[in-house]
Amino acid sequence: MASSRYPTFDSYLADLSPAAADTMRAMVECVLAQFPQLTLKMAWNVPQLQCGTQYVMGFSAAKRHLSVSPWSKDVMSAFADRLAPYEPTDNLFRVPPEWHPDAALLHDLVRARLVELGECS
């Protein structure tokens, strides 16, 4: 079994640009402050927020953007208008590394995902 490249969130952030690391940390902290029942886990070498064993929101970094996924095509579809400025796909949306997180949007996405899961709400 292969070992994780990033065993911790901090080790993941250490490989990012300062702007991307600051934005990633701000997004995760913003969600966890509003939803303390969620836990941060590294899975597939990227940070994921979980409710029990269910994935609620995932984050990843690329060279020119950060990606955020609520783990649900239905949630993405329901928020299509609000996500339009953020290069959405069926599964995720992209933000610039220096993005100032939209707390209301992140909270609403998580809330919708939790309703969909029927737990941790």
Enumerate the language-model features and the residues they cover:
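Charge-dense, helix-prone N-terminal extensions
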Residues: 1-121
